[in-house]
Amino acid sequence: MRFKLFALAFTLTALCSERVLSQDSAGKEIEGIQHSFFVAGPSFTGIIDEEGKETWNSGRAGARDGFVLEDGNVLIAWGDEVKELTREHEVVFHYKKSAENGELGTCARLANGNTLITELGVKPRLLEVDAEGAIVVEVPLKPETDNAHMQTRMARKLANGNYLAPHLLAFKVKEYSPTGEVLTVFKTDLEELGGREAENWPFTAIRLSNGNTLVNLTHGNKTVELNPKGEVVWKVSNEDYEDDPFADPCGAQRLPNGNTVIASYAAGGDRVKLFEVTRAKEIVWRYMGRTGFITSKCSRRTASPSPGTP
């Protein structure tokens, strides 16, 4: 069986010291799964190649979000600023958080050239910032908590012009209009998911091409796909595995082949930090190198952007 993927590499035979592995459920190596990826984590922010080697280091760990752009530059959000860096570390875009708010949580380059950013704090808001660093769109957010760190994380702009934001302590993913009106609410404290006791805090929310929404639920240690009515149509969690690969999953990405890549932030030691799972819940790729990641973006062999939705 041969897959054409755009993500992390896991080839135990290629580089055991870097803990890269690509196997099927029977332990047989799957030929063709070779990925490099951008990663934002507490000890490293940069690019790792398909053999598990670090090929580019941003120079600053602890990033919250990031993307490899079409031209090879890297857009990164830290808690206090967003930068676009060339591979030579030249800063070509910079936004510093406002003095009134406590931290930043999102960065994404939009089709119109603006950069999507979320600010968390006394004035939680979603921003579009132009190439010169000027705020051109401001959308007030309703996270239902004053805890800045837990207000929202990876927000994204939708094809219809609205915005999708996960609100952790509200146990909700909300779709906002450009004026800040809440249009749709997806609840993550559903009884079938364990209710609030399961701490299904939504961290990543991605609108898929089929209209469903992919959500990583951090402390709940699960990933779910919700239909437009908010009903669970797919779920994968530690209940499906013996080795508990979910450890505070934060970032996620749906690949073009339909598989999902999940980042386990709290994984340490030899535990799985990143893994790729099929619709049938078979894990076909794993990375067990550095400490856990907040997010990762799967890329082609040259660390260029993947067409998969992150």
Predicted feature locations:
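Bacterial N-terminal signal peptides
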Residues: 4-17
